Amino acid sequence: MSDIGVYNAAFGPDRAGLRNLKRVFWNLEAPSLYEQALQRGEAQLAAGGALVAETGIHTGRSPKDKFVVRDSGTEDQVWWDNNGAITAEQFDRLHADFVAHAEGKDLFAQDLYGGAEPAYRVRARVYTEYAWHSLFIRNLLIRPERDALGAYEPDLTIIDLPSFKADPARHGVRSETVIACDFTRKIVLIGGSSYAGEMKKSVFTYLNYILPKAGVMPMHCSANVGAQGDSALFFGLSGTGKTTLSNDPARVLLGDDEHGWGPKGIFNFEGGCYAKTIRLSREAEPEIYATTERFGTVMENVVIDPVTRLPDFDDASKTENTRCAYPLPFIPNASATGRAGHPKNIVMLTCDAFGVLPPIAKLTGAEAMYHFLSGYTAKVAGTEKGLKGPEATFSTCFGAPFMPRHPSVYGNLLRDLIARHHVDCWLVNTGWTGGGVGTGRRMPIRVTRRLLTAALDGSLAKADYRRDPYFGFAVPTSVPGVEPHILYPVKTWADKAAFAETAKRLVEMFQANFKRFEAHVDADVRAAEPTMSIAA
């Protein structure tokens, strides 16, 4: 085996069981990784300088193919209702087969950090079969200084082999695709998928497992910081506006996806962004658009013209989940440290396609925990499913696939931190108003931004409020610059009876979903549930 690049020879591939490799390319930077990816036919060069790769049959994550080793260390720690389990023996066979599959191959290794706060960061070493995967994860995680690589000792090892195919009978998995996490031995194996997001989410999953033990709250959220040092968190599932709304020219961007909240404040887990590009426009999101025209950015499943190499961000023929991955410094107003003080505001974003939630509501600590555990949004059902109306989605903690522990662990941590630091909490509906999908309209972005500005500058906390008769939370009666009727969802509907019926239906969905958490929360959180006595 020959080595190319800088690394700590005392912690070589043998520490991960890897042997008889052809070559290992250590900690290569973007120019070298471009050369390797292009020479190997892994990717193409776009007109603006970005590297463009396709992921094949997997154009998104494979949550049903993700497994955690169930052993004495994890038996009572992992939420097994939400996490697939394999035995240590099955993992041993899988690992042995990964090692055998890697023999004679070139691998690319990156030594990186997950976590901008040194006291809580994890040193993640990522071995990849593809050069473009190596560039992707280098963009997404935090890059150590060059002179630190010689002494780098990994805490977590990820082996990413897209050409490996798992054997369900032998390995105890579901298909040829596998993401297997051994928290005890600190190894993650990814096989059968070229979707690069599996790597970053594996680091996130590991941090979500280890940090609560240290009293640190891991969060699937974006974050930004105001001119006075006031930080804000934005929770939200895909399509709710998490990336767009946190990317505010008047505030410093801390990060777009994963953060921790510890004794000193909040910190980014990552050193880059993984933004959706479908229907991306220069006018609507100029900062993100500009990254697609830069050398160093990786674009995933974006269609490019074979002659001009210009990207077509409106083309969803490969997938709706087209992405670009770039280092945070590519965003002009990004934080240089990835750290900030304790948040002053928490915003929980939902895209309510039923059109019955108000555009903003102020939450108590108990209500914030209720809605955090619920993790509600709604999506418009695709015609291929034959559904005419919206489809409710409840993803606890706004990121159920990445949460190894029971949601109450994260919910209690969040509630304690909210109380300790006197954080104002808000529920913001970026979905529909005046009716649901088909009869109403999307909440105007100018309204959402005006409401967020008022929430983040502190003025909205002093407003007059009414109690929502269906969902129980406090809704402002007026906000300067916002039409008063839009704050009263029922007033935006022409058919008041249809509004009442739709609101009642959504209330029932909340109640049915929350039954699984009732035994794990205090009475005041149970009391924060939407009130059917009025909705009936």
Swiss-Prot record:
Pathway: Carbohydrate biosynthesis; gluconeogenesis. One of its GO terms (cellular component) is cytosol. GO terms for biological process: gluconeogenesis. It comes from the Bacteria. Signal peptide: none annotated. Keywords: ATP-binding, Cytoplasm, Decarboxylase, Gluconeogenesis, Lyase, Manganese, Metal-binding, Nucleotide-binding. InterPro entries: PEP_carboxykinase_ATP (IPR001272), PEP_carboxykinase_C (IPR013035), PEP_carboxykinase_N (IPR008210). ATP binds at residues 201, 220, 236-244, 285, 323, 448. It is found in: Cytoplasm. NCBIfam families: pckA, PRK09344.1-2, PRK09344.1-3, PRK09344.1-4. Involved in the gluconeogenesis. Catalyzes the conversion of oxaloacetate (OAA) to phosphoenolpyruvate (PEP) through direct phosphoryl transfer between the nucleoside triphosphate and OAA. Belongs to the phosphoenolpyruvate carboxykinase (ATP) family. This is Phosphoenolpyruvate carboxykinase (ATP). It comes from Methylobacterium sp. (strain 4-46). The lineage of its organism: Bacteria, Pseudomonadati, Pseudomonadota, Alphaproteobacteria, Hyphomicrobiales.
